[in-house]
């Protein structure tokens, strides 16, 4: 077993060896290096064919038509293109958008930008298990609502929103429905032929493909129109200009193909590893799972260890790569806004650790992690005066701290 152990697959995945090998054939003079927009010679045709194959592989995984796939630089750009593109195109119909407080920053910050442009945004609070109350969602709809953006699987707590039901509500009210599926594609079966989803964001690197490439699904029937946010050349049917990075697109396509083939065996394996980890940690005193355990992606476990500071626990676990909060926001020492939205107090939010398992995780690594976490929590609590007071039966909520 190699140290450190990687348990942060929700932040990024290593590129699968099969994917890397395939990508190498699309870079040098000996491979296919042409520009897919070069229509006048074989180098361009070969590159275009490679892009078409990848487009089909991505569409196959989500039950879409390959003409509905637009390549981008990643899920952040896909979120921006979907939300800004739809809001700007349909703004004559209304300027109201619905989203949720626990969305990824790529959605929340995009909505904040639209607010500066004169749009109104309703930010729904989730229930304490992280799920959206469908009645609250319905109640937020106004005559001028044009767009709703709700993620499929949350990147921090792994809860699965009911996008089928939300999609049906949106379709009935003629509202465009965008789903950030960065954390769910390849982990949960998605068939867009059966879902009322109009726009869906995806990433390459969260699925063992390369970083720097993603895609946006844009429904054709009923047709969804977007205003471009990147101009120049009219690539990707005018929605996203720029020379296509063939090697990255080929990598993303191959990664999605492998996921489609292996999902039926891989997800039960990951669930068993996640459950093994949970069963090993759940008996530690004062530990709480964040988010619904029932409606949750099989690879995620987010636990708060009360009376332990999350940052110091991560330091004590330096042989294990885990995170507190998401990779995009864990650099700030603020407690996770996702956990705060669930109603957790600052202390519990600060003591949370996210474990996410993946393709290269083994049982041996999980068992090692369980032992290490147990001893680290025990050690850190021995240093904590709060833990002593809690063990002595002091009601912590009644303590008044004086400012120095």
Curated annotation (Swiss-Prot):
Q: Which residues carry this modification: N6-(pyridoxal phosphate)lysine?
A: 206
Query: A Pfam family in this protein?
Result: Aminotran_5
Q: In which pathway does it act?
A: Cofactor biosynthesis; iron-sulfur cluster biosynthesis
Location of this chain's protein in the cell:
Cytoplasm
Q: Where does pyridoxal 5'-phosphate bind?
A: 75-76, 155, 183, 203-205, 243
One Gene Ontology MF term: pyridoxal phosphate binding
- Tell me the active site: 328
Q: What is this protein called?
A: Cysteine desulfurase IscS
